[in-house]
Amino acid sequence: MVLKYLKALTSSNDNLEETLLNVYLERKQNFEIFENRSSLVKQEIEKLSSSPSTIQISTSDSDNNHYSITFSSGYGSGVICKRTGMFFNNSLGEIELNPQGFLGNTYSERLISNMSPLIVSNKESIYALGSPGADRISTALAQVIYNYINNNDWSTAISKPRFHVNQNGSVRAEPESIEDNKNVTFTNANDMYFGGVCVTGINDDVVAYGDKRRGDINWTN
């Protein structure tokens, strides 16, 4: 979905909001298996007093190894695939994607995940990146990659204001991210709603970039 959002951002379509909404609806219609998702999610949310949080860890070293993982508290199978270092997911237990509960109506069906840990590269460098943020993960990553393509600076790409088009066509946006209209609800700048993209990689040296929306955590040694 990140690639679909990125394609929408780079298209020449004059109505960007409509294009992004169509991507969202394509995801819902073709990749989500529950027609009653909206009402079931609402019921489950009302039952919850709190929800677990998602973390993104991006790591790179001077030997050109790169690692990206997006993980939620209370989720995951606890099993790593041999010789790969990859965790098996357990999206069957993710309420947003499977509101009917663990193993509910999933036989022979393919479940999606909002999580999008990425390894991206250009001719000079390789980078690991990802973000928490539920269904804003794809749009946050697409916008950051789009910004990087335009300015070749990860710090600037991460800090630029973001917006997200919801299923109903409404838009939540940080100031100066999109033109104001009747569909837009503006948040504060650097709102954690829009994820927390973190990037590591190698330029001339190992680099790391955090996101002010989620604590701006980064460390190099």
Give the label of every model feature segment.
Residues 3-10, 129-152:
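Alpha-helical support elements that line or immediately flank enzyme active sites
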Residues 63, 109, 141-142, 147-191:
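Extended C-terminal subregions enriched in glycine
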Residues 61-62, 175-221:
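Cofactor-centric catalytic regions
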Residues 2, 64, 117-119, 141, ...:
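Hydrophobic, well-ordered secondary-structure elements that form the walls
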Residues 52, 81-83, 112-115, 136, ...:
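Short, solvent-exposed loop/turn segments at the edges of secondary structure
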